[in-house]
Amino acid sequence: MAHKKGGGSSKNGRDSQSKRLGVKVYGGQKVISGNIIVRQRGTQFHAGRNVDIGRDHTIFATASGYVKFHTNKFGKKTISVVTE
């Protein structure tokens, strides 16, 4: 018979790395073609003019200009790049 309890193992102690999601460039800021504007899971934001969407739903600029956040006619949050 043991006179001390065995040291039990913990089932906790794990965590995943942060994915660094969110808005990377805000409204009114200047971007060049290829700049990432938003990293997201699913389409919280939709692509507008001069913007495209990657297969992981990342929104990036396809032209140089200024970022504009707005709502489209269907009520969806949309991001566009306004060229100079």
Swiss-Prot record:
InterPro entries, alphabetized: Ribosomal_bL27, Ribosomal_bL27_CS
Molecular function as annotated in GO: structural constituent of ribosome
Gene3D superfamilies linked: 2.40.50.100
Any one cellular-component term (Gene Ontology): cytosolic large ribosomal subunit
Keywords for the protein's UniProt record, in alphabetical order: Ribonucleoprotein, Ribosomal protein
Protein family: Belongs to the bacterial ribosomal protein bL27 family.
Protein name in UniProt: Large ribosomal subunit protein bL27
Species for this entry: Brachyspira hyodysenteriae (strain ATCC 49526 / WA1)
